[in-house]
């Protein structure tokens, strides 16, 4: 393992602290932080707390501290951080988060690689809602999201998708993007007993309108 002085620095920016035991997307982010923290010095910026209360926030902050990740929630100055530390790459979750921060990163650290993690393609999710409702307003919303989302992706050096299917959609809608797929990361576990049951219940996050 490299020494702290020689380790490259990564900047992660997310809407909130990763609630790794509550949502699939947050678990994926936490796993990425676990992996990258082995060989990188990481600064993690969260726009907001989790919304689960101070006790839960403290637990999630402690988990990041255990990985030696410097975490800042809400009250931080991106400009000061960018002026103080040279980053190899900035990884931002969601296109609307990236849209806020890319300009400052490119101005203050033009050599920093800008990476946008889609988590999922938002306009594709919105379109699935339209397929159910057949409401013209939902189609209009889908088209608006698509324009905004692709506009942001074009500014990035690399786009990360969770599935190859999402990568194919982006390649078709916006040729020329550099896309990499990083799926959900889980520890494999064996069921205590094999009962032949192959059913699976998935509960989507209700904070997403199409769900």
Where are these regions (language model features)?
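Short beta-strand->alpha-helix junction loop in the catalytic core
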Residues: 120-122, 182-190
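Short N-terminal targeting/anchoring amphipathic segment
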Residues: 82-100, 113-115
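Active-site proximal beta-strand in glycosyltransferases
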Residues: 108-126
